[in-house]
């Protein structure tokens, strides 16, 4: 099997999952400031603002029964460090946001395939999933 189509398919799956979380956050009153923001230390899936809080959201889209508990185990200490560094880079480019309280959230999206097609659902949203140590 050619890895390029699979990679494109996985990337599209991730994009759809991020879209679901983006919609969820907007419904909760959050203003999306960035999606798939990249820097040398990594990527921030979503950055959003509401009141005096800035959130950096890591989105994991998985099929049921995935090895990493729906994506949760994929956000281990090394990934958290990369997200923190990326958030610091984001704040250095947007200093007007640096006075806000910052939070790291994780959103878990489930992708189900059936004969009728593919469906997505927000399984869990974990505010303050990890803290800066």
From Swiss-Prot:
Highest taxon above the source species: Bacteria
Name this protein carries in UniProt: UPF0102 protein CYB_2119
Entry-linked Pfam families: UPF0102 (PF02021)
Species of provenance: Synechococcus sp. (strain JA-2-3B'a(2-13)) (Cyanobacteria bacterium Yellowstone B-Prime)
Family: Belongs to the UPF0102 family.
Alphabetized InterPro entries for the sequence: Restrct_endonuc-II-like (IPR011335), tRNA_endonuc-like_dom_sf (IPR011856), UPF0102_YraN-like (IPR003509)
GO molecular function list: nucleic acid binding
Annotated Gene3D superfamilies: 3.40.1350.10
């Amino acid at each position: 099997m050619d890895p390029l189509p699979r990679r494109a398919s996985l990337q599209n799956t991730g994009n759809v999952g991020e879209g679901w979380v983006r919609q969820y956050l907007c419904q909760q009153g959050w203003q999306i400031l960035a999606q798939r923001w990249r820097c040398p230390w990594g990527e921030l899936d979503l950055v959003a603002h509401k009141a005096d809080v800035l959130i950096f959201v890591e989105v994991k889209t998985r099929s049921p029964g995935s090895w990493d508990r729906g994506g949760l185990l994929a956000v281990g200490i090394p990934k958290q460090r990369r997200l923190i560094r990326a958030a610091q880079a984001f704040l250095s480019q947007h200093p007007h946001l640096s006075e806000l309280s910052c939070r790291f959230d994780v959103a878990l999206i489930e992708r189900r395939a059936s004969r009728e097609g593919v469906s997505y659902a927000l399984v869990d949203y974990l505010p303050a999933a990890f803290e800066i140590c």
